[in-house]
Structure formats: structure tokens, C-alpha cells
Swiss-Prot record:
Function in brief: Specifically deglycosylates the denatured form of N-linked glycoproteins in the cytoplasm and assists their proteasome-mediated degradation. Cleaves the beta-aspartyl-glucosamine (GlcNAc) of the glycan and the amide side chain of Asn, converting Asn to Asp. Prefers proteins containing high-mannose over those bearing complex type oligosaccharides. Can recognize misfolded proteins in the endoplasmic reticulum that are exported to the cytosol to be destroyed and deglycosylate them, while it has no activity toward native proteins.
Protein name per UniProt: Peptide-N(4)-(N-acetyl-beta-glucosaminyl)asparagine amidase
Stretches assigned to the PUB domain: 33-96
Positions with a binding annotation for Zn(2+): 247, 250, 273-274
Biological process per Gene Ontology, one example term: glycoprotein catabolic process
A GO term for molecular function: peptide-N4-(N-acetyl-beta-glucosaminyl)asparagine amidase activity
Keyword Hydrolase: yes
Family: Belongs to the transglutaminase-like superfamily. PNGase family.
Subcellular location: Cytoplasm
SUPFAM superfamilies, per the entry: Cysteine proteinases, Galactose-binding domain-like, PUG domain-like
Organism of origin: Drosophila pseudoobscura pseudoobscura
GO CC list: cytoplasm; cytosol; nucleus
């Protein structure tokens, strides 16, 4: 993990003083201009890392001398980024050994801070950079007791069977979630109000569907809908999937595994690329995962299960013998355990591993603060065949082992809690004996197709009713410009003057600045490191609209330029139009218009994937959607 010096970033920002309003504005303008120049310099390095010209800052350059280096603290920041200055030279140079990952992190946080100041916000402290994360990552997390102490308990099993011994170790490990200081930190990192608001909106939409007769399902519980929002936020914004750690020289993630070693309690994968070794720490300690926020399915499930506990869900960590880890959360409304796979952003689709992923399943166990359960039968529907595969221990001995672990976990529970757990366990065991047919979506290895879950995830008609109207800066420039990066899932409004771009506003997530959409979602391909907007699976068509309104001004459209990248396969078809509200495609001299994209066609089970908007690499810094409107 690459850390950056946030103090240097914060130091160059305008300070609250008793100076006049004009003086404060001058200081702010100087800061904005200096950071703009620095961002351009860093952007050049990132775009052409091997060009030595871009790694040199000449001190005889007037703009560098008068606008960048004149800002108090800027030289210290340059050193923090990695630039070096020697007395004999008249320049700063950025050595090749400074990693692109470090440069990118400084670029991201400086850009974010500048945008905040530009929009009028005056944040108290700089946010820690995180490409796909809206919540600042703390640099250090305090716990009540050290990690090893949190997961160490007296052994109760007397078996020599290593497989059974591992069950007790897994059960002990989840007890780290109950650290009060850790729980408080976790709660502070979750945007609970925002997620609850989204869940409430989805619930009201579903209530309308039920009232109109369009949906025959039972009204969902707000806590269940909040769980879906939490899963989506965690997968798309909070945690980052890592195949290989980035090379510190070239930034590539194609490095080869050289060896695995142990440092303290942490297993470390050592990769090599460009002759340099890089380390990927496979943390189990939640206090470390809340800082790094990256990993694979094990880290995903471990951290997500903990965050569920932060919101007081009864949650348990699920380990399978086929090398996959996920979460189960108890729904108090449905009185059953819900399967949640945070690394795949999937809720309530337990049979997908057996029927969609085609995995061989023999043992699956779930662990919580006061329970341990053999849940293999929830994830299979051919129980007799599965029993034939279970050869690691005697079934009777397995039951005795789980009972012993369960008793260990419940020894400090109240009589009332023990009675509740006993009743719940009995009902769960009865439910686990039932076999059911997989849904169509489980057969294809993806999330449940239930309308309630699709609606709660926003996978239906989504009306945000966001309309763009020119602000003061845009009116002054007679411009209305909007661009979108699918890699970062961010919109930017900006003005352009002689090639110089000034950011005005940013909007996080593709839904945030749309007018409406139907059957659209953002697909992230971790293996290929690509992102794009596509149709929902099993839908024949989709639509998304962005709307613009000039009626409250005396301006109209003079001309426009549109970059709108699409990709189709086979018989897939995408229609893109810029039109007035009454459907006319000539928008010059209009005061209202909209951009409309319609996706349709394709064949087979992956027809939805044959129409894609804004497909780009997750590392791309381009804007596949860029609309520039000139007004008069």
C-alpha cells in the first residue's frame, strides 16, 4: 500500500484568517492556480511516464516560478510527491523509481481538494485518496486490544483431526468483530444516512408497485433493503479487488508471483516486475483491512461481515471448502439467513455456486459471535450426492464439534438469548433439509432475479429527474459542458478557455446526473479491468436520458460537440440522439434538449452484453462521454 503525506497537501490550502474578503479570495485564487499547474504536470507524467521532459520542472519557467513555487508549502509538497532538486541544477526532477501509483494518489487527492475549494466548500482536512471510494480512509485505526488477543481463546476441542480443529480457529477469528472501538470506527465509515435514504426511496417505489398490482410480492423490510444498498456501496465504492499488486516502477498489475512469505501474523505475496519486488499483504485483521480496503474474496467477506455487525445485523462469515468466502445476514422480517456475496455484489442467490459456477461443494460453514453452523445444504440441492463427497470426518463427530463450538460461543449469553438462538437454529436446520430448484439466474451464476431485489438495487426503471441548467460560471462563458468517466463512475461539469479546463462540479455515480433510465447498470469486469454501462441481464432493451434546460436564461444553443463512445457485438444495436423535448433532432436555437441512448438487440444468454456504453479500462483517464455546448 502506498501512503501519501496528507499534511503537505493540507498545508498549501487557504487558511482561515482575519484578512479582508478580497484578500481571502486572492489567496484562494492563488491556491487554485498553483494546484491547477501541478495537476497538469502530474497528468503529463502519468500519461507519458517514460518521457524525461515531463519529469522535469524548470525553475526559469515564469508560471512555475511565480504561480506554483510562490505558494507557501509547495516545495515541501513537491518533495513529498518525489521530486528532487539539486543546487547545481535549475530544475526539479522526478526520479524514475517514484511509482506511478504514488503519483496517481497525489494527483487524485489534489484534484479532489481543488474541486472542493472551487465549488465553495472549505473542508477541514483532506480526504485520503481512494479511486473508487467516497469515504476517506483513515491512516491508522485504534482497537481496544491487539489483533492476536482479539482472536485467541481457550481451545475446547480435543480432536486430532486438523479439519475439525480449523473450524474452531475460524470461529475464534470472527470474534475480532466485537471490539467496541473497532465497531465505532466502522460505523463512522459507512454513509448510513445516504444508504438509508436510497433504501427508503426503493421501498416507496415498491410500495407503489404493490398498491398498483404490478407486483404480487410481500412488502420488503427497510433493513433488508438497506443491506442491499450496503452491499452495493461496499462493492462499488468502498473495497477494491486486487489480482496482483501494482509494479512500483511501471504500474502494471501483470507481475508474477515469486514467493509467499509470512511477516508477523500476515501472509505476504511477493511479486516481481521490472526487476523490482512488490508485496501484497493478505490481511485478516479488520483494523488493517479498513485502511487498505483491497483484497480478494476472503478480504471482501471478512471486512463486509464486520461492517454488517457495525449496523447491528446478525451476520456470519461463511467459509467453503472450494476456496471461496462470503457472508450471511439474518433477516428478521423473513426469519431466514440471506446469502450475500460482497465480492460479486450478489444478494440471496445461494445455489449459484453449484449451478452457475459449477463448483464441487462438500463443506460450507458459517461463523458468528454466538453460533457455528454447517450450512452446506443451503448451497446445494442434491444432498444425498453431497454426503458421498464428505470424507474429511465422521458426520457424528462433525455435529459434536459444532455443538462444542456453539456452546463455547454462547457461554456468556443470557438465558433469553440462548433460548432465541436454540429456536432459530432448530428452524434453520429444518429449512436446510429442504431441496429447491435453482432459479434461472442461479443457473447462470448471478444474483436472484426476484423483482424485490432487482428493484431494491435500482435494477428497473430509475428516475432521478436531474436536469442541467447553466450556473453563473457557465452563463459567463456561454458554455455548458459535461463529461463522464466510466472508470471512476464520475461526471464533471467544466468550462474551457483556450484549452484550459476549469472544473465546476462533480457528480459521483452514473445515476446521479441522469434524467431517467430503464434497465441500465454499470458493469465492472475485474479480470479484464474494464467498466461500461450495459443493459440489465435478461432484458431486451434499455434507455438512458440526460436532460438540459436553458429556459430560465435568455440563452439558446448555438452549437454543440458530442463524444459518445459505444461498442456493439453481433446483432446488438445502440441508437444515440440529441433532440429537443418534442423529438426534433435539430437543437440549434433551442432552449431545451436531451441526449438519449437506446440499447437493444443481441443474441443468446449474454445478449445484454452485446450493447455497451463508455467501455474503458479501469485505469483510463479519458472521458468516453463528453458534451460541449456553446450558447448565445
Amino acid at each position: 500500500m502506498v501512503d501519501i503525506n496528507l499534511e503537505c497537501v493540507h498545508f498549501i490550502e487557504p487558511k482561515n484568517t482575519r484578512s479582508t474578503e478580497q484578500q481571502q479570495q486572492n489567496v484562494k485564487n492563488a491556491y487554485l492556480e498553483a494546484v491547477r499547474i501541478l495537476l497538469v504536470l502530474l497528468e503529463n507524467v502519468l500519461s507519458q511516464p517514460n518521457n524525461t521532459k515531463f519529469r522535469t520542472i524548470r525553475l526559469d519557467n515564469k508560471a512555475i516560478k511565480e504561480k506554483l513555487l510562490s505558494l507557501p508549502g509547495c516545495e515541501k509538497l513537491l518533495y513529498a510527491i518525489g521530486f528532487r532538486h539539486t543546487p547545481s541544477s535549475n530544475s526539479y526532477t522526478l526520479p524514475g523509481e517514484v511509482s506511478l501509483q504514488q503519483i496517481q494518489k497525489y494527483y487524485d487527492v489534489l484534484r479532489e481538494r481543488r474541486t472542493a475549494w472551487l465549488s465553495g466548500a472549505m473542508p477541514k482536512s483532506p480526504a485520503h485518496p481512494k479511486a473508487a471510494c467516497s469515504t476517506p480512509s483513515p491512516l491508522f485505526i485504534k482497537t481496544s486490544v491487539p489483533y492476536r488477543q482479539r482472536i485467541t481463546f481457550p481451545r475446547v476441542l480435543r480432536t486430532s483431526n486438523r479439519f475439525l480443529q480449523s473450524l474452531e480457529l475460524y470461529s475464534d477469528a470472527v470474534m475480532q468483530y466485537e471490539d467496541e472501538l473497532l465497531l465505532a470506527t466502522g460505523r463512522s465509515l459507512i454513509p448510513v444516512d445516504d444508504l438509508t435514504s436510497k433504501a427508503s426511496e426503493k421501498m416507496m417505489a415498491m410500495q407503489d408497485l404493490i398498491a398498483s398490482g404490478e407486483c404480487s410480492e410481500k412488502e420488503p423490510c427497510i433493513r433488508d433493503l438497506l443491506l442491499v444498498e450496503l452491499t452495493n456501496w461496499f462493492n462499488t465504492q468502498f473495497f477494491e479487488w486486487v489480482n496482483n499488486i501494482q509494479c512500483q516502477v511501471c504500474g502494471s498489475e501483470e507481475s508474477k508471483l515469486r514467493r509467499t512469505q509470512t511477516e508477523g501474523d500476515v501472509r505476504v505475496e511477493v511479486n516481481v516486475c521490472c526487476g523490482q519486488e512488490s508485496k501484497f499483504y493478505r490481511y485478516n485483521d479488520i483494523s488493517q483491512l479498513l485502511v487498505s480496503r483491497k483484497g480478494r474474496c476472503g478480504e471482501y467477506a471478512n471486512c463486509f461481515t464486520f461492517l454488517c455487525r457495525c449496523l447491528d445485523y446478525d451476520a456470519r462469515l461463511v467459509h467453503s471448502h472450494f476456496d471461496h468466502v462470503w457472508t450471511e445476514v439474518f433477516s428478521e422480517t423473513q426469519m431466514r439467513w440471506l446469502h450475500v456475496d460482497p465480492s460479486d455484489n450478489v444478494v440471496d442467490s445461494p445455489l449459484m455456486y453449484q449451478h452457475g459456477w459449477k463448483r464441487g461443494i462438500d463443506y460450507v460453514f458459517a461463523y458468528s459471535r454466538d453460533d457455528a453452523q454447517d450450512v452446506t445444504w443451503r448451497y446445494t440441492n442434491n444432498h444425498q450426492e453431497i454426503l458421498k463427497l464428505r470424507k474429511l470426518c465422521d458426520e457424528k463427530e462433525l455435529i459434536q464439534t459444532l455443538n462444542a463450538i456453539r456452546e463455547k460461543r454462547q457461554q456468556n449469553c443470557s438465558a433469553e438469548r440462548k433460548n432465541f438462538l436454540s429456536q432459530r437454529n432448530m428452524f434453520e436446520v429444518i429449512g436446510l433439509t429442504l431441496e429447491r430448484k435453482p432459479t434461472e439466474n442461479e443457473l447462470k451464476g448471478r444474483s436472484s432475479g426476484s423483482l424485490s431485489w432487482r428493484q431494491s438495487r435500482g435494477e428497473h426503471t430509475f428516475t432521478n429527474i436531474f436536469v442541467f441548467s447553466p450556473n453563473e460560471a457557465e452563463l459567463k462563458k456561454c458554455q455548458l459542458n459535461l463529461r463522464y468517466s466510466c472508470a471512476t463512475d464520475t461526471y464533471e461539469r467544466y468550462t474551457k478557455d483556450d484549452g484550459q479546463i476549469t472544473l465546476l462540479n462533480t457528480y459521483k455515480t452514473w445515476q446521479s446526473a441522469q434524467f431517467s433510465s430503464k434497465n441500465i447498470y454499470r458493469k465492472v469486469e475485474r479480470d479484464w479491468k474494464m467498466a461500461y454501462l450495459a443493459r440489465l441481464e435478461d432484458t431486451d432493451c434499455a434507455e438512458i436520458i440526460w436532460k438540459f434546460d436553458l429556459t430560465k436564461t435568455n440563452l439558446k444553443v448555438k452549437s454543440y460537440k458530442l463524444v459518445f463512445e459505444t461498442k456493439t457485438f453481433g446483432e446488438g444495436k445502440i441508437d444515440v440522439s440529441v433532440q429537443t423535448n418534442d423529438g426534433k433532432t435539430f437543437i440549434e436555437n433551442s432552449s431545451e434538449f436531451q441526449v438519449v441512448a437506446k440499447l437493444m438487440g443481441g443474441k443468446g444468454d449474454v445478449a445484454w452484453q452485446h450493447t455497451q456504453l463508455f467501455r474503458q479500462s479501469l485505469n483510463s483517464r479519458e472521458y468516453p462521454f463528453d458534451l460541449q455546448v456553446e450558447l448565445h
